[in-house]
Every structure is written in structure tokens, then in C-alpha cells.
Amino acid sequence: MTVTADPVTLMKQEVGKAAAALVKSGSIVGLGTGSTTAYTIQYLGDRLKSGELTDIVGIPTSFQSEVLSKQYGVPLTTLDAVDHIDIAIDGADEVDPHKNLIKGGGAAHTREKVVDYLANQFIVVVDSGKLVDRLGSVFAVPVEVIPMAITPVTNAIKQLGGKPELRMGVKKAGPVITDQGNFVLDVRFDSIDDPVNLEKILNNIPGVLENGIFVNCADIVLVGEVKDGQPLVRRL
């Protein structure tokens, strides 16, 4: 592990390490997407190399987590080859006091939702800046849409009071394309008072594959903080 003086990076490393420490030998592990979860994958690889951890297999939620797992020596499998997931570890863009989440900043929320909801235990890893009183306070709700339906879905979301914006690529001309080959609308709402209902309403729009509201699924939230220049991890 590369040592860095940056306290934010150190914090992410500590949260990732704390999550990796919860994985037991023989586990089937859902591997999330994002900068903090990347450290979890790295620490899982370290534990495997040292012999502290044995006989685990990971199920990646994105091309990013698949590439990192191969890089750090974490064996992989697919949902076709297993009948359960013991533990999933993933990040979030927002976490409310009820442990409801907004995810999808990396456009991987569809695969993440499949894996995270299947897991017997779902661990969320975030920094303290991701904690909010109400979902949608800072982050828009990502909605994955099949390309041919982008216009009718946009119109339907506007009728719900949402303000959708097509996510554009960085270092790529045109819109972001998900691992499933779809577009992402980032939708802002003035207030998300009932995330459970909003998740269902959005998913009932024809052409929507999945949205980034995750409700009633997180078992443990590990929160990283920096105090007096030192990284700390606490549990919600």
C-alpha cells in the first residue's frame, strides 16, 4: 500500500481497510464501485496474499471493480455460478439518517443494486461529506435509460417535478454510456420526502432500467472522517 500524506486519501484507505476486515474466509463478496471501494478491493488482495484470508470469490459490479480485482489478485465469479452473496461492500453518494442511499455517480448503480440487494450483509463505505438529512440534498438521482426512450422518459420525469439532465462523458464526446450500453439522466428534485415511493415510481416509467435510490438495504455504514489531521472510522 502506497503511503500518502493526504488526509482524505488516508481516510478512504482506512474505511476501505475496515470494510475488508469484515470479510471472512470462504465468503462470496459483492465488490462495489468507486474510489473508496477500490481500497477495499486492494486490501482484500493484501489479505489473500498474506494468507490471512482464504477461499473468497468476488462478484464485480462494474468493469472498474473487475479490473481492480484482477490487478490485486481477488478471484472472481458471476451470479450464474452462485446461489447467494455473503457480503457486499459498496460506496454511496448520499446517506440519510435511515441508511437510505443515492448511488450511481459512477453510472454503475444498476449492477450495484442487483448485487447489494442480494447480499446477506451490505456494508456501505463513505466519507462524512456523504451524510445528509434528506436524500437529494446535494446529489442528483441517476436514472439509467435505454437510448431509444430518452425523450419520453425525460418528459415523464419532468411531469413528476424532476429536473433531468443527460450525463455527458469526460474525455469522451457525447453522453456517458453505462456498462449495459445505456444513457444516464441525473435528476434533481426540490425535495425527496418519500424515497421508497419515488424509487418505485421512477422504475415504473417505460424505458427506465434502474435508478440510484437504494432503500432498506444497508446493514452497516462505515463513515470516514478526518480529525486533527488523522483519519478515523465510525459505524452508523
Swiss-Prot record:
Transmembrane segments: none
GO biological process, one term: pentose-phosphate shunt, non-oxidative branch
Keyword Aminoacyl-tRNA synthetase assigned: no
Catalytic residues (UniProt): 112
GO molecular function, one term: ribose-5-phosphate isomerase activity
SUPFAM superfamilies with a match to the protein in the record: D-ribose-5-phosphate isomerase (RpiA), lid domain (SSF75445), NagB/RpiA/CoA transferase-like (SSF100950)
Binding residues for substrate: 33-36, 90-93, 103-106, 130
UniProt keyword Isomerase present: yes
Its EC number(s): 5.3.1.6
Gene Ontology CC terms, in alphabetical order: cytosol
Pathway of action: Carbohydrate degradation; pentose phosphate pathway; D-ribose 5-phosphate from D-ribulose 5-phosphate (non-oxidative stage): step 1/1
Keywords: Isomerase
Catalysed transformations (reactions): aldehydo-D-ribose 5-phosphate = D-ribulose 5-phosphate
Subunit-structure text: Homodimer.
HAMAP family: Rib_5P_isom_A
Family, as annotated: Belongs to the ribose 5-phosphate isomerase family.
Cited PANTHER family: RIBOSE-5-PHOSPHATE ISOMERASE
Functional note: Catalyzes the reversible conversion of ribose-5-phosphate to ribulose 5-phosphate.
Protein name: Ribose-5-phosphate isomerase A
Organism from which the protein derives: Nostoc sp. (strain PCC 7120 / SAG 25.82 / UTEX 2576)
Lineage of producing organism: Bacteria, Bacillati, Cyanobacteriota, Cyanophyceae, Nostocales
Underlying gene: rpiA
